[in-house]
């Protein structure tokens, strides 16, 4: 199984794991489950960190590298197909990062781990 983490889920893994349902933690820790973080999430965290809206205990690049090395996290790049697919995505959600993450989960056939209730309005295999 391929699991794509929404940005807040990635941050909660480090700072508030109690907010994540146990079945998602089990998937995250399952060696047979490939866990991904979108480059869109990294971009979002960098912007929020620079604006003072997100405080990190490590520089972002170190945080990402640590999770990749320690937990096998993989980075999902942004492809042109992901961008073009946004054209057909209904506008239930206005956040550009969430919209891109949603499209990536759809096109890459990934389960999307997110507490964002707006995602239920889309054809995505979401879990929470």
Set out the residue ranges of the language-model regions.
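Short, well-structured N-terminal submotif of metal-dependent ribonuclease cores
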Residues: 1-38, 51-66, 108, 117-121
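Acidic active-site catalytic centers that drive phospho-/nucleotidyl reactions
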Residues: 6, 44, 98, 116
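Generic structural signal for small/hydrophobic residues in well-ordered secondary structure
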Residues: 6-8, 45, 86, 105
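Residue-level signal for well-ordered alpha-helical positions
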Residues: 16-17, 48, 89, 125-126
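Active-site neighborhoods of divalent-metal-dependent phosphate/nucleic-acid chemistry enzymes
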Residues: 55-58, 70-115
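Basic, glycine-rich
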Residues: 120, 125-128
């Amino acid at each position: 199984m391929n699991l794509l983490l929404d940005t807040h889920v990635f941050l909660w893994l480090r700072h508030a794991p109690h907010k994540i349902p146990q079945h998602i933690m089990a998937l995250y820790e399952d060696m047979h489950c490939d866990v991904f973080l979108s480059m869109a999430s990294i971009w979002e965290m960098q912007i929020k960190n620079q604006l003072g809206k997100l405080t990190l205990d490590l520089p972002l690049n170190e945080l990402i590298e640590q999770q990749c090395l320690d937990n096998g996290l993989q980075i999902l790049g942004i492809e042109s197909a992901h961008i073009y697919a946004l054209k057909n995505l209904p506008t239930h959600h206005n956040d550009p990062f969430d919209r891109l993450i949603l499209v990536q989960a759809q096109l890459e056939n990934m389960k999307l781990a997110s507490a964002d209730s707006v995602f239920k309005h889309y054809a995505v295999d979401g879990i929470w």
